[in-house]
């Protein structure tokens, strides 16, 4: 008989804790564990955001940006940092200059990511809830878009703090790596190390996947076929769009001047803060108008749907405001919307339109399938100048003293006033 008091139960040691000592002492292992943790978080959140109800809340908000950075900074960033801390001492045959500094980098990096992500998540959920808030009468609770911007401005400060902390950690990495290289011996001694590979499974280079890895030509051809098939699947719907759009629903293409304005819109990065895609949900319809349709983007190359709404959607902006409003808005956004956080674009008022390039642009779009007339193709420059003169005359009648008939602001106004005005269903 055994006495119960003499029996000691020792639970089995989980295999993943075999290196727990290193996890406590080695910053490199800590970086890898943190990277995998952030990867797991981002991987879980991705499918979560694919759920229709969740996506309708988070789409176009800061939440999506936070989600992307969780993987970019946490997974890619920390994995890279860990690899650098590991490989640099190996390459220079020395020890890492300061493990303590690497640990500090780890923790301020984690803190920075958490500050950034949590602030973006909170801002995104706030935006989504405010945009979709509808009262008992079926009206928007926050009809003025800028109300939703003001509410999340304090969270911008936390986001900035998170970014500063992450960058500070990166500076520590650079300094640590620099000092590690500096302390390396001047004459590097190469050592030949024999390593015995122990494996319970014998490796047969002529079997299975090992054999496939050695067939470079066959592997290249198979990869090329896969890429071509994927490309065709993506491109085919665009090339066959006419099959899906009724003739009476087709839209008019942008005029040469509007095309120039569209290029300015893209060049200045307007698409990073504004979308041009109205969703089929009640709040989007109340705020912006009818949902976007396929034909409205059929001549957009590339499309300007956007992925974030720091500012409102512009899909149906055309004719909503007079030309003077757009002029003042570009010169000084605070002149028309006091709480606006949009930057000013005063150089558009003084920079000239490159009229000479318009004919080539129109010809290129025509080759891509945009149905421009022979007159547009042969006389694009003069047609653009005529339209610009009309807009400049309207602005002059509304109080603008400068002659802007050849300025970029005129082309941009022409483009903005054309949005949602080209026909369609």
Per-region residue spans from a language model:
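Hydrophobic cores of alpha-helical transmembrane segments in multi-pass integral membrane proteins
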Residues: 1-8, 27-53, 64-91, 98-148, ...
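Long, contiguous internal "core" modules enriched in hydrophobic/ aromatic residues
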Residues: 8-22, 201-204
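Flexible, glycine/threonine-enriched loop-and-boundary segments that flank and lead into catalytic domains
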Residues: 20, 55-64
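Individual transmembrane alpha-helices with interfacial aromatic-anchor signatures
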Residues: 153-163, 399-408
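Post-cleavage N-terminal segment of exported redox proteins
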Residues: 186, 190-193, 197-254, 371, ...
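Electron-transfer interface patches adjacent to heme c in soluble/periplasmic c-type cytochromes
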Residues: 223, 228, 269, 286-408
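Electrostatic cytochrome c docking/interface patches
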Residues: 242-266, 278-281, 285, 310, ...
């Amino acid at each position: 008989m055994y006495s119960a008091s003499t029996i000691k139960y020792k639970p089995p040691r989980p295999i993943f804790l075999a290196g727990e000592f290193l996890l406590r002492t080695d910053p490199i292992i800590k970086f890898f564990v943190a990277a995998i943790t952030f990867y797991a978080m981002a991987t879980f959140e991705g499918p979560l955001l694919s759920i229709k109800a969740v996506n309708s809340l988070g789409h176009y908000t800061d939440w999506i940006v936070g989600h992307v950075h969780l993987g970019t900074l946490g997974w890619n960033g920390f994995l890279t940092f860990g690899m650098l801390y590991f490989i640099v001492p190996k390459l220079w045959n020395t020890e890492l200059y300061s493990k303590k500094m690497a640990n500090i980098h780890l923790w301020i990096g984690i803190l920075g990511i958490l500050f950034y992500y949590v602030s973006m998540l909170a801002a995104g959920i706030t935006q989504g809830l405010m945009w979709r808030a509808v009262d008992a009468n079926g009206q928007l609770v926050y009809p003025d878009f800028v109300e939703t911007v003001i509410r999340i401005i304090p969270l911008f400060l936390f986001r900035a703090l998170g970014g500063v902390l992450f960058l500070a950690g990166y500076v520590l990495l650079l300094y640590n790596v620099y000092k590690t290289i500096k302390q390396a011996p001047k004459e590097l001694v190469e050592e030949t190390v024999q390593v015995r590979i122990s494996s319970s499974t014998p490796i047969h280079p002529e079997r299975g996947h090992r054999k496939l890895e050695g067939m470079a030509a066959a592997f290249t051809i198979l990869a090329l076929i896969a890429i071509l098939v994927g490309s065709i699947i993506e491109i085919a719907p665009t090339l066959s769009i006419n099959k899906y759009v009724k003739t009476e629903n087709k839209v008019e293409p942008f005029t040469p001047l509007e095309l120039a304005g569209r290029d300015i819109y893209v060049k200045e990065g307007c698409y990073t803060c504004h979308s041009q895609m109205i969703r089929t949900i009640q709040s989007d319809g109340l705020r912006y108008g009818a949902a976007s349709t396929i034909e409205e983007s059929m001549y957009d190359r590339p499309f300007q749907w956007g992925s974030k709404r720091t500012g409102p959607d512009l899909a149906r902006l055309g004719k909503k405001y007079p030309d003077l409003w757009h002029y003042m808005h570009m010169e000084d956004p605070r002149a028309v919307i006091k709480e606006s956080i949009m930057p000013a674009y005063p150089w558009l008022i003084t920079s000239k339109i490159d009229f000479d390039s318009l004919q080539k642009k129109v010809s290129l779009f025509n080759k891509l399938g945009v149905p421009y007339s022979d007159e547009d193709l042969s006389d694009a420059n003069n047609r653009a100048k005529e339209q610009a003169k009309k807009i400049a005359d309207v602005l002059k009648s509304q109080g603008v003293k400068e002659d802007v008939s050849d300025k970029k602001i005129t082309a941009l106004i022409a483009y903005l006033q054309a949005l949602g005005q080209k026909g369609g269903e």
